[in-house]
């Protein structure tokens, strides 16, 4: 509910200010499980992509967004939780396994999840080697993977 309210409020503002150029939305299924895999250039990627995709996108977001100290950390955590984002521990091993299982559960419920296969933002705009979690989720769930290229964000 908060997701749709924020989306309805922000879309006109962001579209009029930034004029995003979007093509290929026909490849995003209207219902059912799907994985949107994108490069990650800036924090704004996580704002723009869900706004232009016509259905809810649940991101697997780094756990630090949910545990930062102070008022800024509290606000960030509240926003991410309100938008239904899921914390991911990127330290590897069993901790990362829990994130994969959460992603698989969401996909089994018909969710559309967003993931940045590189695992973090690119410091220089280049595409870096992706991690294997997205391939594992796609293979185990049978969800289609929709590649996305974010440019000039």
Task: Identify the residue ranges that each predicted region occupies.
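Soluble catalytic domains of membrane acyltransferases
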Residues: 3, 7, 14-153
């Amino acid at each position: 509910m908060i997701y749709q309210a924020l989306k309805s409020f922000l879309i006109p503002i962001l579209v009029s200010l930034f004029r995003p150029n979007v093509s290929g939305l026909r490849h995003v299924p209207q219902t059912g499980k799907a994985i949107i895999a994108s490069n990650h250039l800036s924090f704004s990627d996580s704002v723009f992509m869900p706004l232009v995709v016509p259905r809810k996108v649940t991101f697997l977001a780094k756990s630090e967004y949910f545990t930062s100290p102070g008022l800024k950390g509290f606000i960030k955590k509240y926003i991410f939780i309100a938008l239904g984002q899921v914390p991911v521990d990127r330290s590897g091993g069993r901790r990362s396994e829990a994130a994969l299982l959460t992603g698989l559960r969401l996909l089994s419920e018909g969710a559309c999840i967003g993931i940045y296969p590189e695992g973090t933002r690119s410091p220089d705009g280049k595409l870096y080697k992706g991690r294997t979690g997205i391939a594992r989720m796609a293979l185990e769930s049978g969800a289609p993977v929709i590649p996305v290229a974010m440019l000039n964000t």
